[in-house]
Amino acid sequence: MERKHHFVLVHNAYHGAWIWYKLKPLLESAGHRVTAVELAASGIDPRPIQAVETVDEYSKPLIETLKSLPENEEVILVGFSFGGINIALAADIFPAKIKVLVFLNAFLPDTTHVPSHVLDKYMEMPGGLGDCEFSSHETRNGTMSLLKMGPKFMKARLYQNCPIEDYELAKMLHRQGSFFTEDLSKKEKFSEEGYGSVQRVYVMSSEDKAIPCDFIRWMIDNFNVSKVYEIDGGDHMVMLSKPQKLFDSLSAIATDYM
C-alpha cells in the first residue's frame, strides 16, 4: 500500500496561504495530509509587514508548525519563490523533521554565503520591476526595504499563463511585503549540519518569468539538488496555472521519498 505523506506548503512573498487553494484538495484527495502555512503579515494575518521586522519573525508560523509535529514525524516541506528562504531557515532548526525540501520556482540558498546571497544576485539581473511600488521602513536594527507589486508586473512576470480569474483574485489579495535582504545579509550562514544535511529537490516551470530558468540553473549549479522536475507550460504561479502537473510532480517526489 502506498504510504501517504504530510505536505507543508509555504507561500511566496506578497501573497498568502490562499495560493494553494487548487493544489491542496488534489493532494488531500490522494490521501495526503496538507498544512498550508500562513506566514506573518501575509494572507489573512492582520499585521502589516512593518510590524514584522526580521525574517525570523516572518517565518515564525512555519517554525511553530514544525515544532508542534509529533516527535518522529517527517514532512515534505515545499517552499515557493521566497519561500525557499523560509524552508532553508526551518531546515536549519529542524533537519530531523523534514523528509525532503522541495524548492518550487524558489530561491535556493547555500551554506557557503550569507543567506541573502542568491537574493543579492537576483537583484543584479536586468529587467526591472516595472510598476511595483518601493518604500522603506526604519526598524530597531536599520532600514527594511518594502515592495508592493504592480498589476502590470504581476500579469507579465507571475500570472501570464494563469486563468484571468486567478490574476484578478491576486490583484485583490496581494499585500505589501519584503525580501528582508538587510536582515538576511547580517545572519549567519546556513549550516551543513542543519539545512545542508536535508535532501532537497527542485521543481521549476518552463515559462517562469519571475525567476528565469537560467537563474534557477545557476542556483542549482551553486548548491546542488538531488533531482530537478520541470513543469512544461507553467508560469511562476504554477500552482494556479498548472495545478494538475504540479500535483503530478509532488506525487512523484512523494513516491521517491517513501
Swiss-Prot record:
One of its GO terms (molecular function) is mandelonitrile lyase activity. GO terms for biological process: glycoside catabolic process; response to wounding. Keywords: Lyase. Changing H236F: Loss of activity. InterPro entries: AB_hydrolase_1 (IPR000073), AB_hydrolase_fold (IPR029058), MES/HNL (IPR045889). The keyword Cytoplasm does not apply. Its EC number is 4.1.2.10. The record marks D208 as: Increases basicity of active site His. It is an enzyme of class 4 (lyase). Involved in cyanogenesis, the release of HCN from injured tissues. Displays R-selective hydroxynitrile lyase activity. Also accepts nitromethane (MeNO2) as a donor in a reaction with aromatic aldehydes to yield (R)-beta-nitro alcohols. Homodimer. This is Alpha-hydroxynitrile lyase. It comes from Arabidopsis thaliana (Mouse-ear cress).
